[in-house]
């Protein structure tokens, strides 16, 4: 076809078997691996940020960092918590970070992490899960929409302070 640019599809890693995939609570020693995966995705290493997140979430019953391992290697993470009464919102779950190794994006690893986080949030008693994305974050927008998320009743506003 004239005018069509095509590129070979990226290699696809087979979907992990249930026996090969483990979703578990993060441990403090996972912070460095999460930072490495996040840096691979975002091209920005943030080790101090991840140490702070891991320290802040440690021991809090309504805050969760979940890790996805395939064959014993960290291949994804998701972070969420219950937040209550911000701007009149009843308690709800918030997902504020998710990362999946690029080689594992087409095999439902992100969906399994999302489902596991939603289950944790349900167990905390909330009935809604929310997130916030940059308008141009098409990858995560497509992912969260594929999970059934859609625009909610709140609008985020901001202004520069300089």
Regions found by a protein language model. Give the residues of each.
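Conserved acetyl-CoA-binding loop-helix of GNAT-fold acetyltransferases
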Residues: 106-119, 146
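Active-site/acyl-donor-binding loops of N-acyltransferases
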Residues: 2-6, 147-162
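A short, internal acetyl-CoA/4′-phosphopantetheine-binding micro-motif in the GNAT/acyltransferase core
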Residues: 97-105
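Acetyl-CoA-dependent GNAT
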Residues: 16, 25-28, 36, 40-90, ...
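Conserved N-terminal entry element of GNAT/NAT acetyltransferase domains
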Residues: 1-29, 162
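Conserved beta-strand-loop-alpha-helix junction that forms the acyl-donor binding cleft
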Residues: 131-140, 158, 162
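Conserved GNAT acetyl-CoA-binding A-motif
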Residues: 121-132
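Conserved active-site alpha-helix within GNAT-family acetyltransferase domains
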Residues: 111, 135-153
């Amino acid at each position: 076809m004239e005018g069509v640019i095509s590129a070979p599809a990226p290699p696809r890693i087979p979907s992990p078997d249930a026996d090969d995939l483990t979703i578990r609570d993060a441990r403090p020693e996972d912070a460095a691996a999460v930072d490495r995966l996040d840096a691979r995705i975002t091209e920005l290493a943030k080790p101090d940020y991840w140490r702070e997140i891991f320290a802040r979430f440690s021991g809090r019953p309504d805050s969760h960092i979940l890790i996805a391992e395939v064959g014993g290697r960290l291949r994804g993470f998701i972070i969420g918590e219950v937040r209550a009464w911000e701007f009149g919102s009843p308690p709800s779950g918030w997902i504020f970070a998710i990362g999946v190794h690029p080689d594992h994006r087409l095999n439902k690893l992100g969906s399994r992490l999302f489902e596991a986080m939603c289950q944790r949030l349900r167990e905390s008693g909330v009935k809604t899960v929310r997130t916030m994305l940059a308008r141009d974050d098409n990858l995560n927008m497509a992912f969260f929409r594929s999970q059934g998320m859609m625009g909610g009743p709140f609008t985020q506003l901001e202004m520069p302070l300089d």
